[in-house]
Amino acid sequence: MRIGELGDRAGVSTRTLRHYEHLGLLPARRRANGYREYDDHDLRVVAEIRSLVELGFSLEETRPFVECLRSGQPTGVSCAASREVQRRKLAEVDAWLGRLHSVRDELAAQLGAPPEPRCAVTPRETT
């Protein structure tokens, strides 16, 4: 399939596909006329990239997953390198959640405390 069809089927723009190609994530085969040629495996690779980006992975972090698929594995998480990237991302998410819980606890504590007397703010009248 050509780049436009791949983009339509994958739900991404041709510009995005060219960007993936530029990064080496989606190497294109060329027809004799110079047109890029893709197959269903490339569609699977694009779906994997999109899924990972939606989970918060950078495009560079998707590389081990793409390489895993290219090696013939049924999923992008079937290889040790991609699983290691996944473990690191999980640790990042856990750290982020810890920070969010701290912020939440602080906000809840502030809301639960009585307002300070010098904090008398009167709302502005709106017209």
Feature annotation, model-predicted:
Residues 6, 13-16:
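Short glycine/proline-centered loop/turn elements that form peptide/ligand docking sites
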Residues 2-8, 40-127:
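Arg/Lys-rich, alpha-helical DNA-contact motif
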Residues 26-33, 37:
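Beta-hairpin "wing" of winged helix-turn-helix
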Residues 17-18, 49:
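Short, hydrophobic-biased segments on the C-terminal half of alpha helices
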